[in-house]
Amino acid sequence: MTQTRKLVTVYGATGNQGRSVVKSLLRAPDSFEVRAITRDPNSVAAQELSILGANLVQADGSQSNQMTEAFQGSWAVFLNINSDDPVFWDPKGPTEFDYGKRIIDSAIVAGVKTLVYSTGAACTELTKGTVSLRHLDTKNQIEMYARSTGAFENLVPIIPGYFLENFLFKQGAFIMGGFPWETDAEGYLTWKVPYWGGEEQIPFLSVADDFGDIVHGILISPSEYHLQVVQAMSEITDYQKMTEAFAKVTGKKTRFQPVLPTWKAFDASGNQGFEDVKSMFGFTQETQGHYFGREATDDQVSKNLKASAVLDYKESQQSPSLKTVRAWFAREFAA
């Protein structure tokens, strides 16, 4: 009996999360057809996805008619909105919530049955107003709106963990001690940040290696995760073990120095982006390390979903295991 392929449309397809989802689904051509929404189909990132087999559709999230047309015929949509899009910083322009609501409404009009939405925890609510993070709070508000519609047969919110890819950006390394790019006066690559909070269970995520597979796993059987917040991560570890892993694979002097006594002592140098980083540490400390909300951090669902996705690949010698922090550092930084 021939299996019917399901059409999945990815909004934010050229971003880190969306690209990972597209690439994973394209490895299972008997299960899924992939449509990638982009503002610029001629961009290098979009063309890369086209070469791999994605069908490109040009559409802008600010235009309801374009979005409805882009979603036509789709069984499922993966939605991630770039919170750092400059359009959201214009006080006269639309907010991220406006975008999210418009896109969700368009998916409903188009008859989409399944929505996997990249969300965030309700930071202000969970910290009783002590800490606010615009991007997390807004994503959570969009999630609540999607829930309130009752329009989707399967609605799966997913929260990505702490991106390992953040370590690839040299520009901001100095604010956190220099790790993994700049040595300090004593010759160490120092990771100098506040404690995470609680039991120091940091959910590191390799977006490129694992996030797409985790979403892929959800789409294999979305009803199992309907209205459940999926925690997406590659490995749970603490900062001490993280820096030790880096030292072992690179041979470089590396250490973790906690900023004490609390997250409030972290110096953001008056930079708004770094203030958000500071608030993130505030959020996790104030919630005792519960980055994903009220539930404790747990990687079992991510492990299961990763394994399901790899089994769905048409051809693969890939391990069904999630990428470890050590293996990620070895690939990206070992000589």
UniProtKB/Swiss-Prot annotation:
Where does the record place the region Interaction with ASS1? 161-206
Q: Where are the transmembrane segments?
A: none
What is its biological role?
NmrA-like family domain-containing oxidoreductase; part of the gene cluster that mediates the biosynthesis of the indole diterpenes penitrems. The geranylgeranyl diphosphate (GGPP) synthase ptmG catalyzes the first step in penitrem biosynthesis via conversion of farnesyl pyrophosphate and isopentyl pyrophosphate into geranylgeranyl pyrophosphate (GGPP). Condensation of indole-3-glycerol phosphate with GGPP by the prenyl transferase ptmC then forms 3-geranylgeranylindole (3-GGI).
Q: Which gene name belongs to this protein?
A: ptmS
Keyword NADP in record: yes
- Entry's SUPFAM superfamilies? NAD(P)-binding Rossmann-fold domains (SSF51735)
Protein name from the UniProt record: NmrA-like family domain-containing oxidoreductase ptmS
Which residues are listed for NADP(+) binding in this entry? 12-17, 39-43, 60-61, 81-88, 139, 163-166
One example of the protein's molecular function in GO is: oxidoreductase activity
Q: What class of enzyme is it?
A: oxidoreductase
Origin: domain of life: Eukaryota
Has UniProt tagged this entry with the keyword NADP? yes
- According to its UniProt record, the EC number is 1.-.-.-
Q: Which UniProt keywords apply?
A: NADP, Oxidoreductase
> InterPro entries from the entry?
NAD(P)-bd_dom_sf, NmrA-like, NmrA-like_oxidored
Describe the family membership recorded for this protein in Swiss-Prot or TrEMBL: Belongs to the NmrA-type oxidoreductase family.
Q: Which GO terms describe its cellular component?
A: nucleus
Q: What is its pathway?
A: Secondary metabolite biosynthesis
